[in-house]
Amino acid sequence: MDAAIGKVFDSVSDFFSGAASASADEFPLCDSDIISGCEKELAEAQDEGRKKECIMRLSWALVHSKMPSDIQRGIAMLEALVVNDTSAMKLREKLYLLALGYYRSGDFSRSRDCIERCLEVEPESGQAQALKKAIEDRIVKDGVIGVGIAVTAVGVVAGIAAAILRS
């Protein structure tokens, strides 16, 4: 388990240093053991600086979870953190994670809003630009699917109407 937590912390460290992958589809997933480890670390944290660091790790793990309930918990934590942030770099990190959480939960509109705020803070962020592209691609894909469903429904109704008129 310590090795798994070590890998997560390395990923978190890479994320915060900008070395993490820029593709929104390549984010790592966390399991419940990693989240439990982050929760334990937070509970054991003594000073305020360490607690803030542990909260960020936990929120990172939650939005990268396989479980939708964990993702929602991470979103709630990050929403509370974003309100009180004055540091531009920390705000960018939180907005990116919040956008990723919304993206993973299927709320693409909120995800896009957060990633645009993130890009206002740091326009050159490759991660944020990649996530924005993934969000926009997904919105377009969902729109095309929606149009396809509507066209199919109209075709079915027209077919039924034509069949009734022939009878």
From Swiss-Prot:
Keywords: Membrane, Mitochondrion, Mitochondrion outer membrane, Peroxisome, Peroxisome biogenesis, TPR repeat, Transmembrane, Transmembrane helix. CDD domains: Fis1. TPR repeats lie at residues 92-125. One of its GO terms (biological process) is mitochondrial fission. InterPro entries: Fis1, Fis1_cytosol, Fis1_TPR_C, Fis1_TPR_N, TPR-like_helical_dom_sf, TPR_rpt. SUPFAM superfamilies: TPR-like. The keyword Membrane applies. The keyword Metal-binding does not apply. It comes from the Eukaryota. Its main location: mitochondrion. It is found in: Mitochondrion outer membrane; Peroxisome membrane. It is a single-pass membrane protein. It holds the Pfam family Fis1_TPR_N. Belongs to the FIS1 family. PANTHER family: MITOCHONDRIAL FISSION 1 PROTEIN B, TETRATRICOPEPTIDE REPEAT PROTEIN 11 TPR REPEAT PROTEIN 11. The C-terminus is necessary for mitochondrial or peroxisomal targeting, while the N-terminus is necessary for mitochondrial or peroxisomal fission. Plants silencing FIS1B show reduced growth, increase in the size of mitochondria and decrease in the number of mitochondria per cell. Overexpression of FIS1B increases the fission of peroxisomes and mitochondria. This is Mitochondrial fission 1 protein B. The lineage of its organism: Eukaryota, Viridiplantae, Streptophyta, Embryophyta, Tracheophyta.
